[in-house]
A protein has these predicted regions:
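Bimodal feature
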Residues: 8-9, 61
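Hydrophobic h-region of N-terminal signal peptides that target proteins for export
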Residues: 39-46
Length: 298
């Protein structure tokens, strides 16, 4: 159906507040509904006493799936149990209709997942306590692919971040800061992606992949007001880390992290929007994450 001749209408959330609903949006109806729902939820939390009409524009553009599927190839930390899917029922019932049901088990930290601040910082947000507005926002992508290709133990530095800002401007408050190392190209080859395909505690010392330098993590806490960080490797700390200092620093400031991010090569350095919604595990240190990017329109 062609809606090109239909004007945009405001959808009222409550008196004095509206969202602009664009009928000729390029997004499918289900995604338009999702964005309206999310904006209502965020607005209800952040705007207690609106005094005048406001129009909120939600992102329009191509949707990029930034999560890997869970299956027997999913990459987990060497000491974590993997993904398991058991069939409870699959087939036609005695009544004649088709029915499927499965029981799945997974560690919190495997595949594309959330690291909640409580994972490395006592008393900070658990998975179910992270404010939703911290899990969505404008995406800033710092590309360190060249450095990571030259050294798979590359520590992402303040200089790497400053080089990005020199070209694209300062990282804005509320951004989702994503580091693109290029390691996503190796998924799900554990040896290429992690540095080893071995499992167990002894395999941890064999891990080799890039991560955030603790000095860069501290600089971000001190100088930028970001919502979250993410990376296309198994951890925001590099593979050879033994103290996981970048986790400690960022999580100490209640900044959550997204690990094993997929399709980061699809996002531009600036202009995209990210929504990253984890499984709501009460008291959880993390959990499976469904993450999407919305590319800017041309």
């Amino acid at each position: 159906m062609d809606h090109s001749d239909v004007e945009a209408e405001p959808t009222t959330i409550y008196p004095g507040h509206a969202i602009l609903y664009q009928h000729n949006s390029s997004l499918p109806v289900m995604y338009r509904s999702l964005f309206v729902f999310l904006l209502i939820a965020v607005s209800a939390c952040s705007m207690d006493n609106p005094t005048e009409d406001q129009v909120v524009a939600f992102p329009q553009g191509e949707i990029v799936d930034m999560s890997y599927a869970y299956n027997d190839q999913t990459v987990y930390w060497p000491t974590a149990p993997g993904f398991d899917k058991n069939t409870d029922f699959e087939g036609f019932t005695p009544a004649g209709f088709w029915y499927t049901a499965y029981t799945v088990t997974t560690a919190e930290h495997g595949g594309t997942h959330l690291d909640a601040p409580i994972h490395f910082s006592e008393g900070k947000h658990a998975a179910d306590e992270i404010p939703l507005e911290r899990l969505m926002g404008p995406a800033v992508v710092v590309d360190v692919g060249e450095q990571a290709a030259a050294d798979r133990d590359h520590l992402i530095s303040i200089d790497d971040i400053m080089a990005h800002e020199h070209e694209h401007g300062a990282i804005a408050a509320g951004s989702i800061l994503l580091f693109r190392t290029g390691f996503g190209q190796y998924w799900p080859d554990r040896e290429a992606y992690m540095g080893t395909a071995e499992r167990g505690q002894d395999a941890v010392s064999l891990l080799h992949f890039p991560g955030i330098h603790p000095e860069a993590a501290q600089w971000l806490v001190d100088n930028r007001d970001i919502n979250a960080v993410g990376i296309d490797t198994p951890s925001i700390d590099y593979g050879q880390s033994t103290m996981f200092e970048s986790h400690q620093i960022l999580f100490g400031d209640n900044i959550p992290a997204f690990e094993n991010v997929a399709n980061l090569d699809r996002l531009p350095e600036t202009g995209a929007t990210v929504i990253a919604l984890p499984m709501k595990i009460e008291g959880g240190s993390g959990g499976p994450l469904r993450m999407v990017g919305i590319l800017p329109t041309q």
